[in-house]
Amino acid sequence: MAKKGLLGRKIGMTQVFADNGVAVPVTVVQAGPCVVVQKKTVEKDGYEAVQIGFGDVREKLLNKPKRGHLKNAGVRLVRVLREIKVDSMDEYKVGQELKADVFSAGEYVDVVGTSKGKGFAGGIKRHNFKRGPMKHGSKYHRRPGSAGAKGPARIFKGRKMPGRMGNERVTVQKLQVVRVDAERNLLLIKGAVPGPKRGLLLIKSSIKAK
């Protein structure tokens, strides 16, 4: 499968019916339109990639470096910039517009987003710890318990403990594109994708698809 990608926003979830009548849960994603801002080359940058931009923005909301970068490229002002790896750099030109129809129904994609923030969470919610007895004199209900032995007299790095949960980069792999609405730049992707409604997403070709 050719490597390609798009930026988009999560609209919400719904369901569609397959040809055999089975209801399929899908996430509706506004994918694009994106614009090619820059082509990274091995000679100049040490690697090959295509930089794409997404989302309209007023000029005064951009900082000077970003504003100058976009003006030098001769493209419209965009809110978000991301890089994607592609198979053939020759297929892309600076200023070219990428729409939802770069993907087709039946393809598999990886979706990258930022998960919903849950705030400060305990061990049971955050790490699926087992709780203690709720009765028979127990005072150990939802506490984390021992965090380490007496010997080292310290807590090792990586110890699972209560703390802030969510609001981190999450990738869900090998989700199937059920439908493509090229006119409205919509992708219907089977299953759930990370983040809240209106959350920014990067949709790219699945690395696990055969």
From Swiss-Prot:
Keywords: Ribonucleoprotein, Ribosomal protein, RNA-binding, rRNA-binding
One MF annotation (Gene Ontology) recorded for this entry: rRNA binding
GO term, biological process aspect, one: translation
SUPFAM superfamilies: Translation proteins (SSF50447)
Basic residues bias (residue ranges): 132-144
Single GO cellular component term: cytosolic large ribosomal subunit
Region (Disordered): 132-152
PANTHER family: 50S RIBOSOMAL PROTEIN L3, LARGE RIBOSOMAL SUBUNIT PROTEIN UL3C
Function of the protein: One of the primary rRNA binding proteins, it binds directly near the 3'-end of the 23S rRNA, where it nucleates assembly of the 50S subunit.
HAMAP family: Ribosomal_uL3_B
Alphabetical list of NCBIfam families matching this protein: L3_bact
Subunit structure: Part of the 50S ribosomal subunit. Forms a cluster with proteins L14 and L19.
Similarity comment: Belongs to the universal ribosomal protein uL3 family.
Name of the molecule in the record: Large ribosomal subunit protein uL3
